[in-house]
Design a protein with these regions (language model features):
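N-terminal targeting signals for export/organelle localization
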Residues: 1-34
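Typically the conserved alpha-helix immediately C-terminal to a functionally engaged Cys/Sec
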Residues: 40, 63-76
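Short active-site neighborhood of thiol/selenol oxidoreductases, capturing the structured segment around
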Residues: 45-58
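Thiol-based oxidoreductase modules, predominantly thioredoxin-like and allied folds used
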Residues: 54, 77-93
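The canonical Cys-X-X-Cys-His
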Residues: 59-63, 107
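Non-catalytic, surface beta->alpha helical segment in thiol-disulfide oxidoreductase systems
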Residues: 103, 108-161
């Protein structure tokens, strides 16, 4: 590599980092709707079903599922709430542990009475390869899903999951 090629490599690398940073900023999940157990309890006892997406701002799958949650929220508008909880926070970890959701992305589905009726959790830390387990309120597997879709989230709220 000649002396002239080194600056070109550095510039190309710098541009790649800028583009990658821009993509990450555009796709990252952003702020949580739930920041405490009290926030979750208020939503759970609000008389409507609630879907809680547990995510991490550094989880690439969470970033790609962001639109999935938005589409489910649009479909369920007026009948259920779709909210987000950042798992790697103090409140997120406590809530995740209480409901057996330790990896992102995971989803908790509460009915209109505030009871956990379904949860969707990765089979392990690599859900892209292994998919997700759909669990009932007691933690028993009721089905599996290869990926999270708006239709899956909507069906879980409507009781078809």
């Amino acid at each position: 590599m000649g002396a002239a090629a080194l600056p070109a490599v550095v510039v190309t690398f710098a541009l790649d980092l800028v583009v990658l940073g821009g993509v990450w900023l555009a796709l990252r999940p952003g702020r949580a709707d739930i920041r405490s157990k009290d926030d979750l309890d208020r939503l759970r006892h609000g008389g409507r079903p609630v879907v809680v997406e547990l995510y991490s701002n550094f989880c690439l799958i969470c970033m790609s599922n962001r639109q999935t949650s938005k589409l489910a929220a649009m479909t369920l508008r007026g009948t259920a709430k779709v909210v987000r909880l950042e798992l790697p926070t103090k409140a997120g970890s406590a809530i995740g542990d209480a409901y057996g959701a330790r990896y992102t992305p995971s989803y908790l589905v509460f009915d209109e009475h505030g009871d956990l009726v379904r949860s969707v959790v990765p089979d392990n830390v690599t859900p892209l390869a292994n998919g997700y387990r759909v669990l009932d309120g007691q933690g028993a597997i009721v089905s599996r899903a290869q990926r999270i879709t708006p239709a899956l989230l909507v069906s879980l709220v409507r009781g078809a999951g």
